[in-house]
Amino acid sequence: MKRTATLLVVALILALNTAQAGQLQALEDYYRDVETVQGVFNQFTLDDRGQVIEESSGDFAIHRPDRFHWSYAGPFSQEIIADGERLWVYDVELDQVTVRDQRAVLGSAPAQLLSGDYADLEELFELAETEDYVRLTPRDGGEAFDEARLGMRDGHPSALEIDDALGQVTRVELDEVRLNDAVDEERFRFEPPEGVDVYEADPDEGIR
């Protein structure tokens, strides 16, 4: 569940912007103006009764259009790195790395947000805005989530929620967000540590 939610989260964070007024316009401005995004996060998964069933935290760095590093500090340490060609998922406690062709994994909505433009966004999602957030509803009913909501506060990305087909909600609260700061490019390179098991995933296998 964590890895599925993570790819959705990372992809959708890319659609957040710092503007508060005219949020759809802010999305378009994002694709024009924002290259890097960094910060820390707290992530919660809620069941269909609104009870928290999983909680985690960590930090992230994104370098558009095709690189990111999403790091979970606990309770189960995990690193997810996209280097532009391959997607690495390193489960630290399991001493296990799963690697995939990034283009195959990120080639469809919502992960296509990583490399798309605003026209792609409009093609993939029905967009609606309120005073507090932008709602994204997949045009293709076969996507991995039913709806996402992106929120901004005080001029920076603050939270997003994803409703999945099982009735669960993944909520991510973002803090210490920095836009267009320099990012150490080593964050987007990954060499499996000595002794870990490395698995090449089937190109048609999704993130689970």
From Swiss-Prot:
Q: Which subcellular locations apply to this protein? A: Periplasm
Q: What is its main location?
A: periplasm
One GO BP annotation of this record: lipoprotein transport
The cellular component terms of Gene Ontology attached to this UniProt record, alphabetical and capped at eight, are: outer membrane-bounded periplasmic space
* Alphabetical keyword list: Chaperone, Periplasm, Protein transport, Signal, Transport
The yes or no answer to whether the keyword Flavoprotein is present is no
InterPro entries cross-referenced by the UniProt entry = LolA/LolB/LppX, OM_lipoprot_carrier_LolA-like, OM_lipoprot_carrier_LolA_Pbac
The positions making up the signal sequence are 1-21
**PANTHER family, from UniProt?**
OUTER-MEMBRANE LIPOPROTEIN CARRIER PROTEIN
Spell out the family assignment given in the record's similarity comment: Belongs to the LolA family.
What's the stated role of this polypeptide?
Participates in the translocation of lipoproteins from the inner membrane to the outer membrane. Only forms a complex with a lipoprotein if the residue after the N-terminal Cys is not an aspartate (The Asp acts as a targeting signal to indicate that the lipoprotein should stay in the inner membrane).
Describe the subunit structure: Monomer.
Protein name listed in UniProt:
Outer-membrane lipoprotein carrier protein
Which species is the source of this protein? Halorhodospira halophila (strain DSM 244 / SL1)
Q: What is the lineage of its organism?
A: Bacteria, Pseudomonadati, Pseudomonadota, Gammaproteobacteria, Chromatiales
